Amino acid sequence: VYVPRAPHHGLKDGKQHGKVRASELVKFMSDSAGLVSGLGDELGVIGHSGGGTLATWLAQYGDGLFSRVLLLSPYYEPDASQVPKWQVALLRNVYGNHLLPDQFFDGALSYRALANYVIVKQNYRNDLKAVGLKHVGLIIGSEDRLIDSTMARDIAEKMAKNSGATLTNETTPAHMGIGHELIWPGDKSVKQYKKELYDMYVRVYER
């Protein structure tokens, strides 16, 4: 298992991720793919939120390296309740190119970082085809109102179909009350249902 840290992420100053650029993310993904290429006969990639954005890119541009992908509430664009659709291009162009001072959603998520992940998504293959991909797993929290869940399902379905891969698309059980935080152990619901959730992730990945 290889768990890399994305550029400017995971630092003591939680706002440093706002410095990230799409070009840095692409280099990070390419370097990571090179590091894991010799780890085994079958490789998979798992990503949550922005990590799901990157996992989708790796599946398509990994030259057949990854046969499985698990997308946990992947962030391709914000839900319309967070950012109206007509503003997404503005977010991508203005904040993605660092033309305005950064702002932080809920005091934590950088607009600039969010915009650069959208830029990565904009550079997916038109047909979303991923050579060598055998299975796509998608899990979205039942109470997740941060991501465009319809887009997440559409991208996962199209990538699976055009790659000749199987697809497992599930939503966490409503009684768990899981939102966007599918893996953070500090989340109350994740902590309460940790075993059930992690069993679900393994099952959907391996199906």
Where do the model's predicted regions map?
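Hydrolase active-site cap/lid region
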Residues: 66-115
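Conserved alpha/beta-hydrolase
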Residues: 1-13
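Gly/Ala-rich beta-loop-alpha elbow adjacent to hydrolase catalytic centers
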Residues: 46-51, 55
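Active-site signature of alpha/beta-hydrolase-fold catalytic machinery across serine-
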Residues: 57-61
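Residue-level signal for short, function-critical loop segments
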Residues: 49, 75, 142-144
